[in-house]
UniProtKB/Swiss-Prot annotation:
Protein's cellular compartments: Secreted
Stretch forming the signal peptide: 1-20
The entry's keywords: Amidation, Disulfide bond, Secreted, Signal
The keyword Kinase belongs to this UniProt entry's keyword annotation: no
Tissues expressing this chain: Cerebral peptide 1 is expressed in the cerebral, pedal and buccal ganglia and B1 and B2 neurons. APGW-amide is expressed in buccal ganglia and several neurons.
Disulphide bond pairs: C172-C197
Biological role stated in the UniProt entry: May function as a peptide transmitter.
Tryptophan amide: residues carrying this PTM: W49, W83, W105, W128, W135, W142, W149, W156, W163
Protein name: Cerebral peptide 1
Main location: secreted
Amino acid sequence: MLLAKISVVVLLLAIDGTSSSESTDNVVLSSSPDSQKAATSRHKRAPGWGKRSSLNDEDLFADSDSAQELLDSVAALKRAPGWGKRFSGLMSEGSSLEAKRAPGWGKRGQEIDVDEDGSEQEKRAPGWGKRAPGWGKRAPGWGKRAPGWGKRAPGWGKRAPGWGKRSGGDYCETLEKMVDAYIYKAVEVDSRRLADCGSGEGTNEPFRK
């Protein structure tokens, strides 16, 4: 029984010794230059990644005797011409920071008047706001009606000569014809009465003449 316990302890010590030796070998391998190169190769980025320029600070500031040379060296680090800049060209002595636009851009006039009280007035271009000569004038005779407009043609409203007038002879003849027609009608009616009713007494025969 005691022998079995001793053999188990020896076996555990042997296993512990082999594991510690493997860990030390791993540490040695990881500290070697070859292992470091293998580790860094797995995390390599594209060439030039994270670099702002191809020049080092030592190359940039070495042998720079003047500010102009420093500016020239900075110019080598810039991006494509005009990239992200509102004006072309680098800032140098006497250069303007204001972006240059086309001449007269955004200006309504060419000059500005300064009054005695110090207020400024914009001068507009000559003739600005003036309408062309004759603007708003209507053509000569506009709104006038043609001569004789509204007048009726000569003789309008006149009836033919003798219209509505009756001649004396025709009128009298017409009346005579009407009387004859009434008399004829009366005689015809009276003869029918005599035939149907006979001659009665007390009639107004004397008036029938």
